[in-house]
UniProtKB/Swiss-Prot annotation:
Pfam family, one: ABC_tran
Locations listed in the record: Cell membrane
EC number: 7.-.-.-
Protein name: Energy-coupling factor transporter ATP-binding protein EcfA2
Transmembrane segments: none
Binding site for ATP: 40-47
Domain named ABC transporter: residues: 3-245
Gene assigned in the entry: ecfA2
Functional summary from the UniProt entry: ATP-binding (A) component of a common energy-coupling factor (ECF) ABC-transporter complex. Unlike classic ABC transporters this ECF transporter provides the energy necessary to transport a number of different substrates. Expression of the complex plus RibU in de-energized E.coli allows riboflavin uptake.
Single GO biological process annotation from the record: riboflavin transport
Variant or mutagenesis effect after changing residue 171 to Q: 10-fold decrease in ATPase and riboflavin uptake
Length: 280
């Protein structure tokens, strides 16, 4: 199931003295089965797009198409609710959304809210708990007694229990230590391999290079560049003009290039760099 934004604009607090336009005539397609990243500075419109994808925001103009459902400025909540089951949204610091007295109850809430029986919702909750790498033994614990990393996994399990076709991630590893970040990104990779479409907002270019199949560069509410990570990270001068970085290994390759080493194309992952060194 893919998503497309067609000439989408969005204005915060429209019609008030405080109105601010966040998106300008945005057109982009997120292909079914892709792992699509959005990069750009704070205020570029990335997080606004995330909340348009599952109907939390309605476009001021233009439309968002999710499968065969159209979201526009006139869409009603009853039309949008089924989309929120298909498109799971993981905010930054999703653990702040936890509320129930037990882990099981918290994870099962979403499916039950969409009409799933309590028994099936709890079964889904246990499956999702295992999927995010947590033990069934945590089911009766208060989520607020868990570590920060465990709380985040419980929050993500609550989204996965709704069995979304698309998972939208807004800086999902913010605040985690390196090991926790690695484990979570590995989980998202496995979910992508299982057939879930992933949409990632991040400022970590190494994650874009390692995991994404497509990347969109945002600036001041506009899409300024799209392509594969390999293609986008070749445009070093353009990215630096936008004050955006490249993967660490690409930066290292640029330093080697300055010393006379020649690359047919700049490597964007460590594996690619090693391949170039070994085979030329």
């Amino acid at each position: 199931m893919g998503i497309s934004l067609e000439n989408v604009s969005y204005t915060y607090q429209s019609g008030t003295p405080f109105e601010r336009r966040a998106l300008f005539d945005m057109t982009v397609t997120i292909k079914d089965g892709s792992y699509t990243a959005f990069i750009g500075h704070t205020g570029s419109g990335k997080s606004t797009i995330m909340q348009l994808l599952n109907g939390l925001y309605l476009p001021t103009s233009g439309q968002v198409k999710v499968d065969d459902t159209i979201i526009n400025s006139q869409s009603k909540n009853k039309e949008i609710k089924p989309i929120r089951k298909k498109v799971g949204l993981v905010f930054q610091f999703p653990e702040s959304q936890l509320f129930a007295e037990t882990v099981l109850e918290d994870i099962a809430f979403g499916p039950q809210n969409f009409g799933v029986s309590k028994e099936e919702a709890e079964q889904r909750a246990l499956e999702s708990l295992r999927l995010v790498g947590l033990s069934d033994e945590l089911r009766d614990q208060n989520p607020f007694d868990l570590s920060g990393g465990q709380m985040r996994r419980v929050a993500i399990a609550g989204i996965l229990a709704m069995q979304p076709d698309i998972l939208v991630l807004d800086e999902p590893t913010a605040g985690l230590d390196p090991q926790g970040r690695k484990e979570l990104m590995s989980l998202f990779k496995q979910l992508h391999l299982s057939g879930i479409t992933i949409v990632l907002v991040t400022h970590l270019m190494d994650d874009v290079a390692d995991y994404a199949t497509a990347v969109n560069v945002m600036e001041k509410g506009r899409l300024v560049l799209s392509g594969t990570p390999k293609d986008v990270f070749q445009k070093v001068a353009f990215l630096k003009e936008k004050q955006l970085g490249v993967p660490k290994i690409t930066e290292f390759a640029l330093q080697l290039q300055e010393k006379g080493y020649s690359f047919e194309s700049l490597p964007i992952t460590i594996e690619e760099f090693v391949e170039v060194l070994v085979h030329g």
